[in-house]
């Protein structure tokens, strides 16, 4: 109580007393007359993100708020913390103050996209009657989730002034729903001696929180099969971009002394892309085969009708995108010409419309198009569900990535039933600032139709000569360096309008 009394009126609007957080603490008499805070927050910080910034943020938040409402994700997992707090809130259901805390509760998560996705997944799994909306502090490298909802891309300051400024934004932020996407992979149980469990990069032991085999008692389990499940909010990718991301993570773990600054990291990323065939297709890189060789792709629209999706043989990476920010704020979907949009039956890419945008890339040079005004990848489809049916014997493994978390996925060569399916699974609440780039289908301020002031691209064949891309840009910025020290999980979508301040050359690979 002493600390609460010493706080400014502003900070009191975020403060949660300990008795609300823990069953082991009793309410003090003075707390009975305390006004309910306008924006009570639980703060989760990945102390390994952003170099030393995560640890510094923990110290600042704990100095400003109740020490017990600020959590270090390296010490406590969010599922255990939230279960404990919500069990206590249930115990206090007849306490009017605690009830109002529960109704007004917000979550702040500081880390990279994987950390933010981790919190999103936990909140979804809890199936709360009043799920708290989430604000994201950009502490990673790409910071796609924070950028999509107006929280910025740059790592924040960690002093009192910076933290109070962020809290003020949280106080004013609006709640926006975004779609959850569920991913299911099923295959026959491998013969003795073979394992098809996902293989995480060496330095990401938590990354498979996002994608794991279901237990024998899970309703999704099927006898005679291995079933894996996961979820994402921003994107799922299959193919070369995931392969390079995986290689980068593994290389950094083996030789950390080589990854001391951003420029060296980016050069290494490019080198890995070259050696593995991402910049130039090669007969010597069978793992870089195109998507059509790996799998048959089907999509379903809202009416539930499945249809084959034609994938050009030049496409070697496919991205299923929900938010307007990919690889550090780039927009692979772009802004289709209105006439051609109508001809193809496309709709604006809202984050809560139950549709996901499917985009393809030929190689890293193709990705350079995103740096140009109106640049975009190959727009393949919008879908409510998408299914990949892997061809028997096509490969013994592939690479996948969800919201910045890559893994190597072994595949049985003698199985013709390997299937990955992505489907819509509810929504989660995000906090968005006035700079939010994501658009809601239910927001009256969101334009339903593109107008003449919008910049459109007429390049609907989704292609630019690779030589022209090289001549204009000289380097690829498509697939950014992933977050260091990330835990794991899920989602983000691409902005309807291009960011006019597209990355400076310091960010180009």
Swiss-Prot record:
MF terms in GO: ATP binding; ATP-dependent diacylglycerol kinase activity
SMART domains: DAGKa, DAGKc
Gene Ontology biological process terms in this record: defense response; phospholipase C-activating G protein-coupled receptor signaling pathway
Enzyme class: transferase
Spans annotated as Disordered: 439-509
Comp. bias (Acidic residues): 453-467
Composition skew (Basic residues), residue ranges: 490-500
Biased amino acid composition, Basic and acidic residues: 439-452, 468-489
Family, as annotated: Belongs to the eukaryotic diacylglycerol kinase family.
Quaternary context: Monomer.
Record protein name field: Diacylglycerol kinase 5
Species per Swiss-Prot/TrEMBL record: Arabidopsis thaliana
Organism ancestry: Eukaryota, Viridiplantae, Streptophyta, Embryophyta, Tracheophyta
Designated gene of the protein: DGK5
């Amino acid at each position: 109580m002493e600390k609460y009394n010493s706080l400014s009126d502003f900070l009191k609007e975020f403060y949660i007393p300990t008795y609300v957080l823990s069953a082991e603490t009793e309410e003090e008499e003075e707390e009975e007359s305390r006004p309910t805070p306008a924006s009570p927050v639980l703060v989760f910080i990945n102390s390994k993100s952003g170099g030393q910034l995560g640890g510094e943020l923990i110290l600042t938040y704990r100095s400003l708020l109740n020490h017990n409402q600020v959590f270090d994700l390296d010490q406590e997992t969010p599922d255990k913390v939230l279960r404990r707090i919500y069990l206590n809130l249930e115990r206090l259901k007849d306490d009017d103050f605690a009830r109002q805390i529960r109704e007004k509760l917000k979550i702040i998560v500081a880390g990279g996209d994987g950390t933010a996705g981790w919190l999103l997944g936990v909140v979804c799994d809890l199936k709360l009657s009043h799920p708290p909306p989430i604000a994201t502090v950009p502490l990673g490298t790409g910071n796609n989730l924070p950028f999509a909802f107006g929280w910025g891309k740059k790592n924040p300051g960690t002093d009192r002034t910076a933290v109070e400024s962020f809290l003020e934004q949280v106080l004013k932020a609006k709640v926006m729903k975004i779609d959850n996407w569920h991913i299911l992979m099923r295959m026959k149980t491998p013969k003795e001696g073979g394992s098809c469990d996902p293989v995480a990069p060496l330095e990401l032991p938590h990354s498979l929180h996002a994608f794991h085999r279901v237990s024998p008692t899970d309703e999704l389990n099927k006898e005679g099969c291995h079933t894996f499940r996961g979820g994402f909010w921003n994107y799922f990718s299959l193919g070369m971009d995931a392969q390079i991301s995986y290689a980068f993570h593994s290389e950094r773990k083996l030789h950390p002394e080589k990854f001391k600054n951003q420029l060296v990291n980016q050069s290494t990323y490019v080198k890995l892309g070259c050696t593995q065939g991402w910049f130039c297709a090669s007969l010597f890189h069978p793992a870089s085969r195109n998507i059509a060789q790996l799998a048959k792709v089907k999509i379903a629209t809202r009416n539930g009708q499945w249809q084959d999706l034609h994938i050009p043989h030049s496409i070697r990476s496919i991205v299923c995108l929900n938010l307007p920010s990919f690889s550090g704020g780039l927009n692979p979907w772009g802004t289709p010409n209105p006439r051609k949009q109508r001809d193809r039956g496309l709709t604006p890419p809202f984050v809560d419309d139950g549709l996901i945008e499917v985009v393809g890339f030929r190689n890293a040079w193709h990705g350079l198009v995103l740096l140009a005004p109106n640049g975009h990848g190959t727009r393949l489809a919008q879908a409510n569900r998408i299914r990949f049916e892997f061809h028997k014997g096509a490969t013994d493994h592939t690479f996948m990535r969800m919201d910045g978390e890559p893994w190597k996925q072994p595949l049985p060569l003698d199985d013709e039933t390997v299937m990955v399916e992505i489907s819509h699974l509810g929504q989660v609440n995000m906090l968005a600032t006035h700079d939010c780039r994501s658009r809601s289908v239910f927001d009256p301020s969101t334009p339903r139709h593109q107008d003449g002031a919008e910049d459109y691209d007429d390049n609907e064949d989704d292609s630019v000569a690779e030589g022209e891309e090289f001549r204009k840009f000289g380097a690829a910025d498509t697939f950014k360096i992933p977050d260091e020290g990330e835990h794991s999980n899920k989602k983000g979508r691409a902005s309807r309008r291009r960011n006019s301040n597209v990355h400076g050359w310091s960010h180009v690979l």
